[in-house]
Amino acid sequence: MNNATKRVVVPALEEILYEPIKVLDHGFIRVIDYMGDDSAIVQAARVSYGKGTKQLNQDKGLINYLLRHYHTTPFEMCDIKFHIKLPIFIARQWIRHRTASVNEYSARYSILGNEFYLPEPQNIAPQSSTNKQCRESDSLPKEVAEKVLNILEEDARNCYKHYTKLMNTDEEGNIIDDNNTGIARELARMNLTLNYYTEWYWKINLHNLLHFLRLRADPHAQYEIRVYAEKMLDIVKAWVPFTYEAFEEYRMCGANISRKGLEVIKKMISGEKVTHETSGMTKREWEELTKILK
């Protein structure tokens, strides 16, 4: 059989195709398929104004320009499909990005495996006192974290035990008690804790993937989703290195500055002393600007 293809092939991505990349304790990411590379972005962009240039440094410059000026369509020419195993509570956060095609493992048709996520002790922390949606950076004392882990593990194991008891089947689907009918899988699943693992296929174009990564690979993102995003960044780097470099330069390591912020910077450059009180900015805006300028 001749397996030759006329498609664009990225050797670095071919090396990891179908291979599970471990994330968290039981999770993974696998690249299942992809379409296009950096050249596909350039090709789509040049349709707008003719054949143009072909040298690699000029391709790189064009990609930098496109990303810097927020062009979107050329980056939509590349697609990638992942197979991802992740905790249910992270999947619910992830699915809020409504720009991908998703097909998830169904607990109506199948029995969920007995695998659940337990955080590392250093990742167990109290609620942030300044941010309603995240934890403090300092973890709980080791002995307290161990108690938390014991509760999480005990609850998860008990819930799975009751899950199989409600269905009257074990993890493999074998009947437990011939005298017991059990209830439907679609009902029994409601008893499982959110740290149990689910799986899905997730297909997305590069433009929307970069938006996802800008938010979820950010230091402020929840740790458990951020580690998935960081692995995906490595995949993007292997797949479209020019785009990755531009993305890192203009999005991940760049900054958006407001009109007032720009005025403050101009005053500072001219030697004028500017304080929060004289800046005309809110406290949070001022803190964000000073953080950028540090």
Swiss-Prot record:
FAD binds at residues 73, 96-98, 104, 205-207, 211. The active site is at residue 216. The keyword Methyltransferase applies. Its cofactor is FAD. A motif (ThyX motif) lies at residues 96-106. GO terms for molecular function: flavin adenine dinucleotide binding; NADPH binding; thymidylate synthase (FAD) activity; thymidylate synthase activity. Its EC number is 2.1.1.148. Keywords: FAD, Flavoprotein, Methyltransferase, NADP, Nucleotide biosynthesis, Transferase. InterPro entries: Thymidylate_synthase_ThyX, Thymidylate_synthase_ThyX_sf. GO terms for biological process: dTMP biosynthetic process; dTTP biosynthetic process; methylation. It catalyses: dUMP + (6R)-5,10-methylene-5,6,7,8-tetrahydrofolate + NADPH + H(+) = dTMP + (6S)-5,6,7,8-tetrahydrofolate + NADP(+). Belongs to the thymidylate synthase ThyX family. Catalyzes the reductive methylation of 2'-deoxyuridine-5'-monophosphate (dUMP) to 2'-deoxythymidine-5'-monophosphate (dTMP) while utilizing 5,10-methylenetetrahydrofolate (mTHF) as the methyl donor, and NADPH and FADH(2) as the reductant. This is Flavin-dependent thymidylate synthase.
